[in-house]
C-alpha cells in the first residue's frame, strides 16, 4: 500500500553547454532520494529538465553560427544524455521551449498583470549576463556580480516589474510558521536576514534587450524574464493551467514535497517562487533544500585550462556506480565537497574494491570452495551471530532516519558499516579454520549463510544509491533484492540456493599514478583541441581598421533602411559596377555598386539589402548613384551584401 505521493524536482539545468560533474551531482543526489522514496513505498514523481531561454544562450548561439533553437536542442540532448548515463530515474524531463510550457507562462504573466501584481516601468542599473541578474551599485561586490564574481555592465531598458513587497510579510510569516520550508537552517537564516527583513525591491520580469525568450503576448517587444519562465516549470510540467483548468495530475501532485537545488539559487526558490505562487493563489512547496557545491580539488574547473571534470570522463575511468558513490558519499550535509582523481582512486580502492567488492567475492568463493556453491542454513548458531544480525536488521531504521533529513552521505555510511561488520564477522568466525574440521561443517555452512543473507540485505539497502551494483550482487547470489520491510528481518535467503560459480569482480583496484597519467593525457588532448578551436575562431576575425570617432549627432545624420532590388544591370564600359534600381518605401533609388565580381545582375534582383539612403548623389562611370548598398569584406577581398535576418518590408528603417 502506498504511503502517499512524493513530488520532487531538481533545478532545471541551463542549456548553455555540457554539464560538468558539479552540475551532475544534483541530478544524482535527487535520483538517490527518488529511488529511496519509491522503494520505501511512496508514489514518486521526479521531474528535471532544461532551462532554454535567455541572453546568454542567444549570444552563444550567434557565436556558434546557429539559431538559438538549434543550440538548445543540442545542449538539452547532451544534458539528458549525461543524466541518463548516470542512471537518473526521472519521470519527466521538461524543456522550457515546449509549446505547453510557453503557453502557460504567457497565461501566468497576463494573469499577474491583470490582477495588478505586474506593471510596466524601466530599469537602470547593472546586469550580469551569466547569472541573468540585475544589481544596484550598492549590491555589487568589489564592482562585480555578488553571486558569481564576474564583470557586470550598465543596463537601461523598459521592463515589467513584479511588486514583491506586496507578499513579503506573508512569506515571512510562512517561513516562521513552517521551519521545515527552507533547509538547511543556515540557508533560511541567510534569506531572512539578507533579503526579506531588510525589505524586497520590485523584481524585473521582462526584457527588451534580447529576443530569445517567451514573448509577452500583449506587448511582444518584451520577452518573459527567467524567473517567471524557468521557475514555473515545476507546475507547468505536471499540468498547471493559469485559467483554472489544471490537470488531474497537477491536483494530485502539487504542492511539491521537495525542490532540490544548489545553494547559489536558494533566493530565487525561497523568495521569488513562493511569492509568485501566493499571487497565483497556489500552495507553496513543502520544502526547498539548498545543497552545497561539489568543487574540484586542484583548483577551479576551467574550459580554457582543459581541466573540467565531466561525468562521462569519470565513468570511463571508474564506472557509473563508483562515480555515484563518490559524489553521494563525499558531500557534507551543508559544506562544499571536493572531488579529485586521487580521492576517487582512494575511495574506490578502500571502500568499493576492499570493503564491499572483496566481501562479496570472498563469500561467494568460500561457498563454492566448501559447498559447491550451495548456501544452506544448518542452524548451528553461536553468540557472535546475534550481534551481526542486530547490526544488519537495524540498519534500515538508521538509513531511513538519515534520509528523513536528506543526509544521503550519512545513510551510505550506515550501509557500509553493515558491510564492515560482515568483514569483521569473517575475521571472528574464521571459515578457513572451520573448514579443516569436518565436525564443524554445519557451523561453516551457517556462517556462510549468515554472510550471504547479510550481503543481500546490505545490497538491497544500497540499491537507491548504487542500483547497478546492487543488482549485480543479487544476481551473483542467485536471489532478488528485498523490500525495505524485508530488510528488517533475518533469514529471507532461501536455504539451499546456489551462488554463481565465477563471481564477477565488482570493483577492480586502480593504481593512482596510472590514473593520473591517463587523466593528464586526456586533459592535454582536450586543451590542444580547445586551443585549435580558438585559433580557427581567431582566423574568422579580422582586425578592424579604426577611423576617427564621430559624435552621436554625426551618426544621426545618416539614414539607413531596408531596400528591395527590383532591377539590376551591368554598367556599360565597367567591369566592376552594377546599377540597381532599389525600392525603399514608395521611392525607387538608382544605386551603383562595385560588386560585379561577386554578384551577377540576375542574382541581385529580389534581394533585400541594407541601404545608406541619404548619401549625396554622385556619378560613377558616368551613371548617377543615389545611395550606397552596405557590404562586408573579408581579408581576401570577398564581398557579401548585408541583409536583414528576417523578412522586413522595403523601407523599414534601420535603427
Residue positions per predicted region:
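Structured secondary-structure scaffolds
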Residues: 1-48, 100-104, 154-369, 411-415
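A glycine-rich helix N-cap at a beta->alpha junction
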Residues: 76-91
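Phosphate-backbone binding interfaces of nucleic-acid-interacting proteins
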Residues: 535-655
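Beta-strand segments within the central parallel beta-sheet cores of soluble alpha/beta enzyme folds
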Residues: 287-290, 474-476, 579
Amino acid at each position: 500500500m502506498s504511503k502517499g505521493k512524493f513530488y520532487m524536482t531538481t533545478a532545471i539545468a541551463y542549456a548553455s553547454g555540457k554539464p560538468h560533474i558539479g552540475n551532475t551531482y544534483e541530478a544524482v543526489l535527487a535520483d538517490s532520494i527518488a529511488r529511496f522514496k519509491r522503494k520505501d513505498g511512496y508514489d514518486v514523481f521526479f521531474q528535471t529538465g532544461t532551462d532554454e531561454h535567455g541572453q546568454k544562450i542567444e549570444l552563444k548561439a550567434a557565436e556558434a553560427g546557429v539559431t538559438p533553437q538549434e543550440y538548445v536542442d543540442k545542449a538539452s540532448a547532451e544534458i539528458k544524455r549525461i543524466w541518463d548515463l548516470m542512471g537518473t530515474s526521472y519521470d519527466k524531463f521538461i524543456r522550457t521551449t515546449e509549446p505547453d510550457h510557453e503557453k502557460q507562462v504567457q497565461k501566468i504573466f497576463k494573469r499577474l498583470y491583470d490582477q495588478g501584481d505586474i506593471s510596466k516601468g524601466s530599469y537602470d542599473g547593472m546586469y550580469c549576463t551569466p547569472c541573468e541578474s540585475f544589481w544596484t551599485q550598492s549590491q555589487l561586490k568589489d564592482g562585480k556580480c555578488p553571486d558569481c564574481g564576474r564583470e557586470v555592465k550598465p543596463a537601461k531598458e523598459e521592463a515589467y516589474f513584479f511588486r514583491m513587497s506586496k507578499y513579503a510579510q506573508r512569506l515571512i510569516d510562512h517561513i516562521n510558521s513552517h521551519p521545515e520550508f527552507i533547509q538547511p537552517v543556515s540557508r533560511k537564516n541567510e534569506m531572512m536576514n539578507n533579503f526579506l527583513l531588510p525589505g524586497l525591491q520590485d523584481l524585473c520580469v521582462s526584457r527588451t534587450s534580447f529576443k530569445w525568450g517567451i514573448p509577452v503576448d500583449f506587448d511582444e517587444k518584451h520577452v518573459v524574464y527567467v524567473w517567471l519562465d524557468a521557475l514555473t516549470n515545476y507546475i507547468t510540467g505536471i499540468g498547471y493551467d493559469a485559467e483554472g483548468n489544471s490537470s488531474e495530475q497537477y491536483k494530485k501532485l502539487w504542492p511539491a514535497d521537495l525542490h532540490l537545488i544548489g545553494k547559489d539559487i536558494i533566493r530565487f526558490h525561497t523568495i521569488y517562487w513562493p511569492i509568485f505562487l501566493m499571487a497565483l493563489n497556489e500552495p507553496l512547496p513543502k520544502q526547498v533544500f539548498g545543497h552545497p557545491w561539489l568543487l574540484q580539488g586542484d583548483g577551479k574547473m576551467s574550459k580554457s585550462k582543459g581541466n573540467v571534470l565531466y561525468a562521462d570522463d569519470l565513468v570511463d575511468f571508474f564506472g557509473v556506480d563508483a562515480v555515484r558513490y563518490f559524489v553521494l558519499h563525499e558531500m557534507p550535509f551543508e559544506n562544499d565537497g571536493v572531488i579529485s582523481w586521487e580521492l576517487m582512486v582512494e575511495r574506490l580502492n578502500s571502500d568499493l574494491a576492499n570493503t564491499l567488492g572483496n566481501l562479496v567475492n570472498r563469500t561467494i568463493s568460500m561457498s563454492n570452495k566448501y559447498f559447491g556453491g550451495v548456501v544452506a542454513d544448518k542452524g548451528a548458531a553461536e553468540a557472535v551471530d546475534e550481534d551481526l544480525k542486530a547490526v544488519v536488521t537495524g540498519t534500515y531504521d538508521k538509513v531511513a532516519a538519515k534520509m528523513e533529513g536528506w543526509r544521503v552521505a550519512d545513510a551510505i555510511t550506515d550501509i557500509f558499516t553493515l558491510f564492515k561488520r560482515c568483514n569483521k564477522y569473517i575475521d571472528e568466525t574464521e571459515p578457513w579454520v572451520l573448514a579443516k574440521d569436518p565436525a564443524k561443517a554445519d557451523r561453516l555452512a551457517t556462517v556462510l549463510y549468515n554472510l550471504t543473507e547479510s550481503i543481500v540485505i546490505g545490497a538491497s539497502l544500497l540499491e537507491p544509491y548504487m542500483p547497478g551494483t546492487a543488482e549485480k550482487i543479487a544476481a551473483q547470489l542467485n536471489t532478488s533484492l528485498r523490500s525495505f520491510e524485508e530488510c528488517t528481518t533475518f533469514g529471507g535467503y532461501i536455504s539451499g540456493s546456489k551462488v554463481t560459480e565465477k563471481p564477477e569482480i565488482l570493483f577492480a583496484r586502480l593504481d593512482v599514478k596510472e590514473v593520473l597519467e591517463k587523466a593528464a593525457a586526456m586533459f592535454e588532448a582536450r586543451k590542444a583541441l580547445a586551443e585549435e578551436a580558438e585559433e580557427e575562431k581567431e582566423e574568422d576575425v579580422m582586425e578592424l581598421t579604426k577611423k576617427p570617432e564621430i559624435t552621436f549627432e554625426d551618426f544621426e545624420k545618416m539614414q539607413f533602411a531596408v531596400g528591395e532590388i527590383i532591377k539590376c544591370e551591368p554598367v556599360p564600359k565597367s567591369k566592376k559596377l552594377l546599377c540597381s534600381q532599389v525600392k525603399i518605401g514608395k521611392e525607387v533609388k538608382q544605386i551603383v555598386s562595385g560588386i560585379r565580381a561577386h554578384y551577377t545582375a540576375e542574382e541581385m534582383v529580389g534581394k533585400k539589402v541594407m541601404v545608406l539612403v541619404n548619401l549625396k548623389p554622385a556619378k560613377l562611370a558616368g551613371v548617377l548613384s543615389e545611395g550606397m548598398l552596405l557590404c562586408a569584406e573579408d581579408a581576401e577581398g570577398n564581398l557579401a551584401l548585408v541583409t536583414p535576418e528576417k523578412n522586413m518590408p522595403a523601407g523599414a528603417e534601420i535603427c
